[in-house]
């Protein structure tokens, strides 16, 4: 799916930290190992590659910042790229699963508000859809930033995403609205934008529920209902209800709404 479908809309930047750091192929298997509070990346024979991988990671992350990265997908459980639950070997021979890959750690620290997921979670359609939505939202945010942040541009961005945000969290959407309604609480537009982005990111991380999607569909239907004849209005209501009952996918009422909006 990511290669055959998503590639039509994004430019992938393939990265293998071990290869790019000079470890070559084929290479010895590496793993995370903990020594006190220090986590290292070692081969099974004990050769330490931590400084090499970490030094590479810091340089690569700076290059990705210049490339305006809009999101990233990482390899799960990888000692370099795993975002969470990476096995960490202890000195007593036990293994914990609370590690984070060396490269992933640097990337996530540098881009705390950029969408990221592990490839294994992309098999879940809801998580995949949520991630892709966040990538496009991030791309558009970077466009807003590149043209110069203003209160008006923040308001325009929020209006464009209002209903998608409502599907993720109605309370979160209200918080964002209140934030933009009180810009004088912030010393500069940049501080306002930073606060907005933090909250926007938190809201978008929440997977939309069917109930919230239904509420948004009904809300949007209200804008066009007065322009519809009774049969079309009933059909739209029926489509939304069938989605709510899990008898139709979301795309069906969405496409119908779009067709009615453009009549």
How would you label these PLM feature ranges?
Residues 1-12:
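Short catalytic helix/loop segments, enriched in acidic residues and glycine
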Residues 44-59, 94-160:
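Divalent-metal-activated hydrolytic enzyme cores
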Residues 14-37:
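Short, surface-exposed acidic-centric catalytic microdomains
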């Amino acid at each position: 799916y990511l290669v055959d479908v998503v590639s039509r809309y994004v430019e992938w930047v393939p990265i293998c930290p071990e290869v790019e750091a000079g470890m070559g192929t084929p290479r010895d298997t590496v793993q995370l190992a903990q020594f006190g509070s220090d986590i290292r990346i070692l081969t099974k024979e004990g050769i330490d590659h931590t400084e090499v991988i970490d030094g590479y990671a810091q340089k690569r992350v700076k290059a990705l910042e210049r490339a305006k990265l809009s999101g990233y997908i990482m390899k799960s459980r990888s000692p370099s790229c795993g975002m969470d639950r990476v096995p960490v070997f202890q000195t007593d021979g036990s293994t914990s699963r609370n590690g984070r890959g060396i490269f992933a750690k640097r990337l996530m620290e540098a881009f705390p508000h950029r969408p990221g997921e592990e490839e294994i979670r992309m098999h879940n359609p809801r998580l995949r859809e949520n991630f892709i939505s966040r990538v496009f939202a991030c791309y558009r945010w970077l466009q807003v930033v590149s043209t110069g942040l203003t209160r008006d541009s923040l308001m325009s961005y929020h209006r464009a995403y209002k209903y998608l945000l409502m599907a993720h969290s109605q309370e979160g959407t209200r918080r964002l609205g209140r934030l933009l309604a009180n810009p004088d609480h912030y010393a500069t537009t940049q501080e306002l934008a930073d606060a907005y982005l933090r909250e926007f990111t938190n809201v978008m991380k929440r997977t939309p529920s069917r109930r919230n999607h239904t509420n948004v569909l009904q809300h949007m239907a209200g804008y066009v209902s007065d322009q519809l004849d009774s049969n079309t209005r009933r059909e739209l209501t029926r489509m939304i209800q069938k989605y709510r009952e899990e008898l139709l996918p979301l795309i069906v009422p969405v496409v119908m709404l779009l067709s009615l909006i453009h009549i």
